[in-house]
Amino acid sequence: MDVAVVRSNLIDEQEALDRIISGISLSDWDLDTASPGWSVADQIAHLAYFDNAAALAIASPDEFQESVQKLLEMYSRGEDAEDAILSPYRTMRPGELLEAWRDGRRNLSEKSYNLSADNRVVWYGPSMGSKSFLTARLMEVWAHGQDILDAIGLKREETDRLHHIAQLGFITRSWSFINRGQESIDTPVKVILKSPSGETWEFGPQGADESVSGSALDFCLVVTQRRNLKDTSLEVFGSAAVEWMKIAQAFAGPATDGPEPR
């Protein structure tokens, strides 16, 4: 799958969430989400900020690095960098915030148009290949969209765009351990998932004795830490597979724990 396909799927995922957000009530924007201290509006603000940050990282890496340094300096002074990110958006009304997110998406779409497979993009931490970079953005909009859906009490029709997130979840297995300062477990684990369209997706060596199997949706919910493993129908066999699913983290940033069982 080439970069253009991932970019197109990212845009489709953003538009799918836009259609949901466009239909909610004004009061829904103020609902609390699973992220402590974050409302539905804050989830959209987060996406808007980082879509623009991603566009800046592509178009002007040096300027992006300067912005990262400013955030790090805020953290080192004990200041709330997260609040600084969200504050400008918290003054906006829902309609204005929605337009701000749309502007950020357009900005990212334009800046990413000419990315090729051999391009790398600077980011928070190591640089990323362009395909992985856009896949991470797709994962973010899907995961934060899930937070919004859970808060409002809605469900969405899942698509095979989940393949991007499932693959990201699989390849970040070692990262999930290393990010916690733990040694990665080398025991092979195969992942067998049923896609929304009914296809079977397989990751990892077929001869592996340990496995994770079930719906692609459940797997994606676990690796993005939107559901506890116990709240899914995933079948996990083997100690290495179990340990992975306990701490799976497909996204960058400090190590975090998934939700408690519902």
Q: Which ranges hold each PLM region?
A:
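Glycine/small-residue-rich hydrophobic helix-like segments
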Residues: R180-V223
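An N-terminal domain-cap segment
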Residues: M1-A45, A54
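Hydrophobic packing residues in well-ordered alpha-helices of helical domains and bundles
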Residues: R7-L10, V40, L98-W101, L134-R137
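Structural signal for well-ordered, non-membrane alpha-helices
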Residues: Q14, D18, S22, D51-A55, ...
